[in-house]
Amino acid sequence: LIALATDGRRRGVIGLPLDMVAMEQGIAGLVPALRPDGWADAAAAIMTTDTRPKLASARLSSGAVITGIAKGAGMIAPHMATMLALIATDASIPPTDLDRYLRVAVEESFNRIVVDGDMSTNDTALLLANGAAGLAEGDPAEFQAALTGVCIALAQAIVRDGEGATKFVTVEVGGAADEANARRIARQIAISPLVKTAFYGADANWGRILAAAGYAGVALDPARL
């Protein structure tokens, strides 16, 4: 069962036709070699400019497992980018529930990262449930938390492996009127070139952070900053 896949799952140079003959020949040879412990090989196979594979997994109290792989290092910005995230569970879950779970997880993970502030024409987050364990997802809250945790781990791995990245920075906003305002401020800080250069140079110029927050389009009380 496929929960969600955005259009355009192809990677590579934009505008060049995909060599379907090579793809079909490759698939024909790969299918007989499929095995349950092939996740690490799959994570390595989808790498492009990545320097290391990205893999995360979680086990539920029911015994079901959620495992995911991802690729991405450049053209990474909020609302996804030139990245792939392929996640599977052996729990038995209806597609409508999978879709809901994945949308929440993606919003709290892949849609909150940035490397270079640029995006691509193609990206995908895919969640499959094959029901092989013969188990339901159990507690919905537990499944959601586990799936979100897997997605966050993969998203953070993408940032840590960002092209030219030397630092991993988390932006936390407190005291905002609502979630939307907090996200706008955090995103503006995260994509600010001046904030990035300050972190790169280990320059504690917090004024750049305030400036970025100030032009995020959200009402601010300077006395609370």
Regions found by a protein language model. Give the residues of each.
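Glycine-rich, mobile lid/loop segments that gate access to catalytic sites or pores
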Residues: 2-110
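Acidic, glycine-rich loop-and-beta core segments that form the ion-binding/anion-interacting portion
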Residues: 94-154
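A short beta-alpha structural unit
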Residues: 12-14, 125-132, 166-178, 206-215
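A glycine- and small/hydrophobic-rich beta-loop-beta segment
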Residues: 130-201
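Internal helix-turn-beta structural module
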Residues: 184, 191-225
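Flexible, glycine/charged-enriched surface loops at secondary-structure junctions
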Residues: 37-43, 110-122, 153-170, 196-203, ...
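Conserved phosphate/anionic-ligand binding catalytic regions in large, soluble enzymes, centered on
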Residues: 67-82, 115-121, 199-204
